[in-house]
């Protein structure tokens, strides 16, 4: 904190960390993060809009991936946890 102005210097603060996901959390896919990923290059380019609108529920977490169930009659999917955000 600067003594003269009373303002906090943000350049010294640590970077903001995304909240760790847990089982049962409601999530959606971040379109920008997913579209720039290796997974998007290896998958169909015509993705359903509901994965970007959410909510999906985290069922399992293994390593860097989360199994997500959408509130639709579709199969559960495994998505890299870097590509999903809290709903």
Swiss-Prot record:
Signal peptide boundaries: none
Superkingdom in the source lineage: Bacteria
EC number: 7.1.1.-
Coiled coil: none
GO molecular function, one term: quinone binding
Basic and acidic residues composition bias: residue spans: 1-10
GO cellular component: plasma membrane-derived thylakoid membrane
The keyword Iron is annotated on this UniProt entry: no
Compartmental location: Cellular thylakoid membrane
Keyword annotations: Membrane, NAD, NADP, Plastoquinone, Quinone, Thylakoid, Translocase, Transport
Its membrane topology: Peripheral membrane protein
Catalytic activity, reaction form: a plastoquinone + NADH + (n+1) H(+)(in) = a plastoquinol + NAD(+) + n H(+)(out); a plastoquinone + NADPH + (n+1) H(+)(in) = a plastoquinol + NADP(+) + n H(+)(out)
Pfam families with a match to the protein in the record: NdhO
Broadest EC class assigned to this enzyme: translocase
Segments for region (Disordered): 1-23
Function: NDH-1 shuttles electrons from an unknown electron donor, via FMN and iron-sulfur (Fe-S) centers, to quinones in the respiratory and/or the photosynthetic chain. The immediate electron acceptor for the enzyme in this species is believed to be plastoquinone. Couples the redox reaction to proton translocation, and thus conserves the redox energy in a proton gradient. Cyanobacterial NDH-1 also plays a role in inorganic carbon-concentration.
Similarity comment: Belongs to the complex I NdhO subunit family.
Subunit structure of this chain's protein: NDH-1 can be composed of about 15 different subunits; different subcomplexes with different compositions have been identified which probably have different functions.
Protein name: NAD(P)H-quinone oxidoreductase subunit O
Species lineage: Bacteria, Bacillati, Cyanobacteriota, Cyanophyceae, Synechococcales
């Amino acid at each position: 904190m600067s003594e003269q102005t009373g303002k906090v210097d943000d350049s010294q603060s640590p970077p903001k960390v995304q909240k760790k996901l847990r089982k049962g959390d409601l999530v959606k896919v971040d379109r920008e993060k997913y579209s720039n990923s290796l997974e998007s290059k290896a998958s169909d380019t015509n993705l359903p809009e509901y994965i970007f609108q959410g909510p999906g529920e985290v069922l399992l977490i293994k390593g860097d991936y989360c199994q997500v169930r959408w509130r639709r009659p579709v199969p559960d999917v495994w998505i890299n946890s870097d590509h999903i955000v809290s709903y």
